[in-house]
Amino acid sequence: MTIIRKSHPLMKMVNHAFIDLPAPSNISSWWNFGSLLGLCLIIQIASGLFLAMHYTSDTTSAFSSVAHICRDVNYGWLIRYIHANGASLFFICLYLHIGRGIYYGSYLYKETWNIGIVLLFLTMATAFMGYVLPWGQMSFWGATVITNLLSAIPYVGTSLVEWIWGGFSVDKATLTRFFAFHFILPFIIAATAMVHLLFLHETGSNNPLGIPSNSDKIPFHPYYTFKDLLGVIILLSLFLTFVLFFPDLLGDPDNYSQANPLNTPPHIKPEWYFLFAYAILRSIPNKLGGVIALVLSILVLALFPLLHTANQRSMMFRPISQLLFWTLISDLMILTWIGGQPVEPPFIIIGQIASILYFSIILLLLPIAGLIENKILKW
């Protein structure tokens, strides 16, 4: 008799995806982040669902409802901080996952990579709208500044902004629709992640060497289920330590003041995971130019498969590309720091240089490095 997991229509799908899936025998811990992102999404949906039971999406009571969750709801403070810091955890895993994809040439699986970029945009949109919901000072002014950027679009800009706001400023209508979108988007992300997996399983996983591994495959379970489980335990340990000991470390103190349209905070800035893009936006003095640079800073990822010039897929044996890759990571850290600083010298020029370097490495230097490495290999 056939085992039920191999015969039952539903179990069969799970079996092919997580149990009997042939996986390369040499994938490292950098391949753990896909499953960890799935865990992050589950944590966010679960904690978000419980928060939504007590939250009120009305400008008069949103701030109070968050205070009520923290003070009066059983373990409400814990659920709130798990959800707030869970977003940071999500983006840490997301950026590490993308970094691994760039380093090991996983972007050559074009469909999987492009769905991944769609997932990144969806996650960023969800996080931005979620940041508005507590209706603190930084929530309100962050929403005002970022949505206002759309007014830079020629001809339709102003109408578009007013349409998104549902009025002439960020107000009750904006908060209600942001809550609705913030609730539905994680489920869309989950569905898109399924498509991401579907495309990945069409080709099979890449591996650190960047060479075909069809001749040496092992079943996903038990090898990688237990390897992923170790990652889960480490991740949850670090996460819970953070939530229970430093819950407000990554938040903005301004968000503990209720939104006030008549009082602007001295420095308006988004959460830390958007600061690199915010720094690129601010480095261009022109409003429309800044918005284009902001979108391109993420959309440029879609060009990686087209700009791959090296004969080898992975950067494992490409020292020049490795140097450029780690320069890019350092550059992103500098941009993140600059995004949190006021717009004054010397931060302006540092941000502009870092922004130019960011695009130069991706669009120019990495493809040239690939060609140079091809020449070196022929010597």
From Swiss-Prot:
User: Biological process GO terms, please?
Assistant: mitochondrial electron transport, ubiquinol to cytochrome c
For this chain, the annotated S-S bridges are: none
Where is the chain membrane-spanning?
33-53, 77-98, 113-133, 178-198, 226-246, 288-308, 320-340, 347-367
Q: How does it sit in the membrane?
A: Multi-pass membrane protein
Superkingdom is: Eukaryota
Annotated heme b b562 binding sites: 83, 182
Quick one: which residues bind heme b b566?
A: 97, 196
Name the InterPro entries for this protein: Cyt_b/b6_C, Cyt_b/b6_C_sf, Cyt_b/b6_N, Cytb/b6-like_sf, Cytochrome_b, Cytochrome_b_C_euk/bac, Cytochrome_b_N_euk/bac, Di-haem_cyt_TM
Q: Which residues bind a ubiquinone?
A: 201
Keywords assigned: Electron transport, Heme, Iron, Membrane, Metal-binding, Mitochondrion, Mitochondrion inner membrane, Respiratory chain, Transmembrane, Transmembrane helix, Transport, Ubiquinone
What cofactor does its activity depend on? heme b
Q: Where located? A: Mitochondrion inner membrane
Q: Which SUPFAM superfamilies match?
A: a domain/subunit of cytochrome bc1 complex (Ubiquinol-cytochrome c reductase), Transmembrane di-heme cytochromes
Cofactor detail note: Binds 2 heme b groups non-covalently.
Chain segments annotated as coiled-coil in the UniProt record: none
Where does it sit, as one GO cellular component term?
A: respiratory chain complex III
GO MF annotation list: metal ion binding; ubiquinol-cytochrome-c reductase activity
Q: What else is known?
A: Heme 1 (or BL or b562) is low-potential and absorbs at about 562 nm, and heme 2 (or BH or b566) is high-potential and absorbs at about 566 nm.
Its annotated function is as follows: Component of the ubiquinol-cytochrome c reductase complex (complex III or cytochrome b-c1 complex) that is part of the mitochondrial respiratory chain. The b-c1 complex mediates electron transfer from ubiquinol to cytochrome c. Contributes to the generation of a proton gradient across the mitochondrial membrane that is then used for ATP synthesis.
- What family is it from? Belongs to the cytochrome b family.
Tell me how this protein assembles. Answer: The cytochrome bc1 complex contains 11 subunits: 3 respiratory subunits (MT-CYB, CYC1 and UQCRFS1), 2 core proteins (UQCRC1 and UQCRC2) and 6 low-molecular weight proteins (UQCRH/QCR6, UQCRB/QCR7, UQCRQ/QCR8, UQCR10/QCR9, UQCR11/QCR10 and a cleavage product of UQCRFS1). This cytochrome bc1 complex then forms a dimer.
The protein, known as = Cytochrome b
